[in-house]
Amino acid sequence: MLIALSVMLAVFAALMIFRQVHSSRQKAVAEIVAERLHVSDLEKYVDSEYSGRYVDAILCEELKSSMLDVYNRVCDVEKRSRILMSHNPSIAKFKYDFENLDGIVDAHNNRFKDDKLREHKAFFDTVLAYPLDDQQRRSIVSEEQNCLVVSSAGSGKTSSIVGKVEYLIQKKHIRPERILLISYTHKAAAELTERMPHPGLRGYTFHKLALDIISAQSKCKPSICDNTDAVFVRIYRELAHNADYRKCLVEYFADYSDLMELDEDEKSKNVRRLQLGESAGRQYCALFPDMDGNEVHVRSGEEKKICFLLTSLGVDFRYEEPYEHQVADECHVQYRPDFSIHYTDGGKPCRLYLEHFGVDEHGMVPTWFAKDRGLSYEEANERYNDGITWKREVHKKFGTRLIELSSADFAYEKARQRLKRELVAAGVPIREVQSDELFDRILPENSMREKVFIRLTATFATLLKTSCRSMADVAADVAQRGDKRSRFIVGKVLEPVVVRYNEILRSEGKVDFTDLIVGATALCNANGGGNYDCIIVDEFQDISMDRYNFLLALRRGNPQAQLYCVGDDWQSIYRFSGSDMNLFCHFDQYFGKTDLNKIETTYRFGNPLVEKSAAFIQRNPAQIRKNIHPFSSDAKTEIVFREYRRGDAVGAIERIVAEIPLGKSVFLLGRYTYDDYLLAKNFRQRRSGNSLFYTVCGREVEFLTMHRSKGLEADYVVLLNCNNGSFGFPSTIADDPVLGFVMSDSDGYLFGEERRLFYVAMTRAKVQ
């Protein structure tokens, strides 16, 4: 027992000695590491080393690199020696600061901005005719490599740009020729130049800048094809003489053009749903009239195809004509078969009925039938099939002839073959219309349908370039997605247009406007970029992929040029022209570390419009959050909704205009130029340049489309035709889905672009 106790005491003593030695070793190693640290307090170091300087992304990375070796050594010693150094204040402080260096730099830069704002207060108070606000000033003194200024309607973004330029020239002593100003229109670029008449400073559009770069570096000014619309009309006319292409167009309109007629809500649902079944209303317009010459509106894409097939087979029909016998009872309304086919047999008028049933080869309805009707799938399937049975029994009872097509038949050729076989068996005379005649009937020369189709081809070819994609890229995407419709339209309908368009430009030695940007980008990349210290871009929410690549090339240099980009994602309304809102909303992902500044005071309008318009647009989670407020709590801008009876739109406009005080400016805004049709029929018109005026109640008011009104303002703004419909607002005209291969991704919010356009239209008003 005594020996065992002695051993235990010896072990305990040894452990105590080991702990003391280990603790001393920990302390000694930590002290050695601490002594070798040249910097332990990075906060003080940054403020001292960069006193009076802005630490931009490049400097921040250099600072991290210079400290990284020391940080790694500390971590390595801890790991290999199993020595915890956090008890040493110097080491603990260094590690914490290094791991939070971005925050330290941001705090330093904010203090830098505060100092500059105090130092240059008099400048910001007087550089314009009115003092710049705090948010505008803060964005101007930023010296980050990438500065994004998120503006708001009427927030003075142009004032911010002018203030930035004057600050760079007067306070940073940057030569005017080293500052590049870019806007989207010639008018805006000219206005910027006029407001800042410094020798060497000039506002450009992207296209004008690209043209000048190519001309200067190649010593040859490019010939620009400035009427591409005419080129696409010419291409269509050429291709329309090709029998194979004409056949493809007939197939396109017969079998694939359905989705162009649907609004975003419908199109966002299952595409199979749109093609198969019945909609609540008649949303599809058949290509040809019925036997009486009446336009036919049907309930599904497949019924639209049946209309085409009947016409192409030379068969007379009416859609949903009442059944020839009275069959309405307590459970059923009067029966209206989908199609009533009329023909003569031996001089005797005959009628045959055709029903389209939305069931598959197993007699099962699509799953969405149940959801739309609030039923279980079994109930929906049973009810629909009960309806089929009832219709068959009606025809059996009265001895009338019924032929049937189902959704299972709708591969185009399969449906045609079956329908033709059934009609022939029933004794219906077939007078097949030739492909050329069908083409001429589908696309009469100068018809609206022809114009819309040519516009589709032009839009696709243009967006293909602005998205910096090739036909090979699109073909790969189409192959991956694997749907028959896209393969057919891209490969058979659109690619021949793109190929011919590029052939014409090459053969005539011309370029289009997108070619200018692509060509100038290549030259800048090859020759080291532009010679600029700062590039300022207005209306940045309209940026497209080709312009983005151009900016990257322009800023290349040693050092690279700073970017100061100003725009409002709430007013991004040009996706159809190639703009990509992602480049704005995710700016830092494309350009790198970014100093984001918001200017949220609107000087144009007041409440309740400020609060209501902001709440409206921010329902879309894709939009950047802002706290918009009017410059004065006394500023008031009312929103008034006026109902009018159908047919009384002119009277409603007259009553509204008559209430507006004389001397106040008035805009009439329409979603489409089509909206001025009613005005032109009822009011005297006057044109002045590109402006259009109407005399209403003895005073002149200006008509603009909502897109054209962007950037403008009036005391009173009247939004016309705010009715749901194809040409209403929001517009339910949908783009063909194939444009999705060349357009930027939608923000995914229902009517997202239409909502932004509505915001633009609302915020033109100062009073009401």
Model-flagged regions — what are they?
Residues 387, 392-393, 546-637:
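Conserved RecA-like helicase ATPase core segment
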Residues 37-45, 49, 53, 178, ...:
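Conserved P-loop NTPase-based nucleic-acid remodeling module centered on helicase motor cores
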Residues 58-106, 231-284, 412-500:
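Basic/charged alpha-beta structural segments of nucleotide/phosphate-handling enzymes
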Residues 661-665, 709-768:
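Conserved helicase C-terminal RecA-like lobe
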Residues 148, 154, 158-161, 282, ...:
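Helicase P-loop NTPase motor core
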Residues 95-153, 202, 281-282, 289-292, ...:
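Conserved helicase NTPase motor core
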Residues 19-225, 759-763:
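P-loop NTPase Walker
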Residues 336-386, 569-570:
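Short beta-strand-loop-alpha-helix junction that forms the active-site gateway
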